[in-house]
Amino acid sequence: SNLRRQRQMCIRDRLITVSISDRVPGWLENSDKGWLTAEYNMLPGSSDQRISRKSFEGGRSKEISRLIGRSLRAVCNLGIINGYSFTVDCDVLEADGGTRTASINGAWIALNDTFTKMVNENKLVQNPFTCKVGAISVGIVGGELVADLDYAKDSNAEVDLNLVLDEKFEILEIQGTAEGKP
């Protein structure tokens, strides 16, 4: 039987759900490991201009989905979740800049809550997270260093940088772009 359960939380303008399955992908069968992945989407009405659902199939959503999944797996002992697959869905209700970093932060919280509940129910022997994860966007706007860029600042930034860090401030992921001279 396929165990399917969802935990939901809303962080500011993002809805994060965690779905659990008692199956792992075929390539992980007989490996003594579970799996953890993520999917990211912006709802059609989340920005000033409606976003077509067809655009969600494009590269940006997939790239952000992979970023979220990699960030979570970087601090997860997949051996502890052996036999389970977890899918974290990050849906943006209102886009205001910083959606990927907010989604990473919310995804870690939702998944940590899920793991804690499963430990309390004796479905996991311990929480598989080895440490906390946090993400932040930073940039240079008008020559000034700015943290947590909103849409207006992000669209005018000379440098836009997303950092994913663990609780020891070790860098797990870095993404950056520059307009003109960085």
Which ranges hold each PLM region?
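Conserved mixed alpha/beta catalytic, RNA-binding, or beta-rich assembly cores of soluble enzyme
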Residues: 66, 87-118
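Conserved alpha/beta core surface patches that mediate binding of polyanionic ligands
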Residues: 17, 24, 65-74, 82, ...
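Ordered, amphipathic secondary-structure segments that act as subunit-interaction surfaces
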Residues: 46-84
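Single conserved hydrophobic/aromatic residue that forms the stacking wall/gate
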Residues: 1-7, 11
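Glycine- and acidic-rich phosphate- and metal-coordinating loops
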Residues: 37-39, 69, 79-95
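Active-site cofactor/substrate anionic-group-binding motifs, chiefly glycine-
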Residues: 15-52, 62-63, 67
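A structural signal for small-residue-enriched, beta-sheet-centric alpha/beta enzyme cores
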Residues: 80, 98-102, 112, 116, ...
